[in-house]
Amino acid sequence: MLSPEILEYYERGGERERLTAGAGRLEFLRTWDVLTRTLPPAPARVLDVGGATGVYARPLAEAGHRVHVIDPVPEHVAAAGALDGVTAEVGDARDLPERDASADAALLLGPLYHLPDRADRVAAWREAARVVRPGGVVVGAVISRFASLIDGVAKGYFAEPGFVSIVDRALGDGVHRNDGSVRQWFTSAYFHHPDEPAAEALEAGLTGVRTVAVEGPVWMTGPRLTEFLADPRLTGVMLDMLRRIEDEPSVLGASGHLLTIARRHA
């Protein structure tokens, strides 16, 4: 279900701590903020497709939701299934082992940026639409087309010649291809232009589609971001400001990640 370099990246824990500090922590807080405003009230049945080790499944279960994780990595499934209130199984976002209209909401927070072919991404959206009830919500996360360019400057990756060609291709067709030889770079992925995820969701038959910026441009601020996140008051101010501009089209391309929210036709 996953290419060898992607599977190896996750098996060695490439994402295990990513959402705990810095820009990763901001990504988590903003994603959680959007979810709390988007998902139906608890107790709802939520399918967390590509939910990995349960970084979002855990707080969703703690909030009273019934959460089922479906992920292609067996180690992820074992970790998520060990969480209180969470069940998990191995599966593919393009062919979910779920009955029609069996969930209140479906999350695609991991699969879409590992499906380089548009047809596969639309299939994942279509499957998510199939398994939620009429009127149910689907939320999908993607990586911005320009994320590797920005990250390469912020982290100094452009000093290494191999990174230049990776970014050059990503800017051209969205495909970020890392064969795993340079481990500090993200594994192979697809980076969406801000216009693409909504178009894919619409093609899959979903309605009420909107795309919001997750981190906005704030993720580029480095040490200053860490200072904000260490202060609960400043964190609250930052989250409030980002919420106010999350729909601003001119901000979407500067955000590291985007969330697209849609519903199955009622």
Predicted feature residues:
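Conserved class I S-adenosyl-L-methionine
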Residues: M1-A42, V55, P59, A79, V137-A170
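Class I SAM-dependent methyltransferase SAM/SAH-binding core
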Residues: L47, G54-D95
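A short acidic, Gly/Pro-enriched loop at the edge of an enzyme's catalytic core
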Residues: R94-A106
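A short SAM/SAH-binding and catalytic strip from SAM-dependent methyltransferases
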Residues: D104-A119
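Acceptor-substrate binding/catalytic loop of class I
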Residues: L115, S181-D195
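A short glycine-rich, Lys/Arg-flanked "PGG" loop and its adjoining helix->strand segment in the class I
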Residues: V122-V137
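C-terminal lobe and adjacent flexible extensions of AdoMet/dcAdoMet transferase-like proteins
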Residues: E200, A204-A266
